[in-house]
Amino acid sequence: MKIGLISHDGKKASMVAFVMKRLDFFNREDVDIVTTGTTGTMILHAGVEKVQRVSSGPLGGDAEIGAMVARKEMDAIIFFRDPLDKHPHEPDIQMLMRLCDVHDVPLATNYKAGHIVIEYLSKK
């Protein structure tokens, strides 16, 4: 299964904590992780063994992951958004969220929702 992990700058520490708490899941043989740039670097340092990194969000990474959703290559997206900050690539973020809805791909935008998605996926 393929899971997208994305986090805004203000949520990167939360994403790292989230991943570290679930390293056994994220390092499973059947789990592939796709991340945006800096998030991927931080997750690798947190102990995830294999990560496919795309561009950073503002440079098109959210759109790249959105394209994977549209091609039905993603099983879930965990996107820790910072709703209190402005993002120049907001149209890409909205497009990614819309594509998840269109293609029925689970999308978690906070820690607790992410936990629920991982619990669901771990039973697949």
Predicted regions and their residues:
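Mid-chain, well-packed structural core segment of small domains
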Residues: 59-98
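Ser/Thr/Gly-rich flexible loops in soluble cytosolic domains mediating phosphotransfer, phosphorylation
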Residues: 85, 93-124
